[in-house]
Structure formats: C-alpha cells, structure tokens
C-alpha cells in the first residue's frame, strides 16, 4: 500500500498516474485531496462543474441522476474512475484499490509526495470548487 500526499498536485496528472499504478495491481491511498489543483480560468472551471452537476434525465426530469460528486475526495475518485476501464472487471477491481481522504484522518505515514510545478496563477483547489458546488466537508 502506497500513501500519496496530493497537496499541490494537478488533478489530471495525479489521476492518470494513479490509474496506471492501480491497473498494475498496486494499492494507493491518497491524502489531502482538498489541496489538489485544477489549472485554468476559475470562473470557467466552476461553470463547467456546475453544468455537469445540474444535468437532468431528459426522458423524465423528476428522476434522479446522473449523480455527480460535490466533495473533494469524491471528485478526485470520479476523475480516477474516468481513466479506468470501469465497465470491465479489470477496471472495477482496480478502482477498489483506490482510497481517497480529505486531510490525513488516520495519521498515515506518507510514502510519496506528488506535486507539480504551477507555471500559472490561474488555478482553483478542489476545496474551493467543492464550496461553490455546495459541499459541506
């Protein structure tokens, strides 16, 4: 089991690296999910995620779905899931090997710290995005 500190990591790069590793059979635990960064224009990112969240079932709008997460750990898990062949048994088994936490609740010792160099001031953390989506964490 590898414990990764995700503070300062870019969302897509972190998710792709974790997806590759869990497909190889490694168990991954990610801590500090709220400090993961999405680069780009803050307003555009918030608008995109809110549109995704507000999608309705066209056939019957009273039904619930599709479900989209609000909390930072769930957003990170969903991003990793999108990078796995989730509808196949191999992808489902790999996804079960991923654990994501806000903060470090179990005081796990960090094996790796993944952080990417930010060359821009245009970014938003998952904590800020979650607040805009209405999360209470």
Swiss-Prot record:
It comes from the Archaea. Signal peptide: none annotated. GO terms for molecular function: mRNA binding; structural constituent of ribosome. The keyword Cytoplasm does not apply. One of its GO terms (cellular component) is cytosolic large ribosomal subunit. CDD domains: Ribosomal_L13 (cd00392). Part of the 50S ribosomal subunit. This protein is one of the early assembly proteins of the 50S ribosomal subunit, although it is not seen to bind rRNA by itself. It is important during the early stages of 50S assembly. This is Large ribosomal subunit protein uL13.
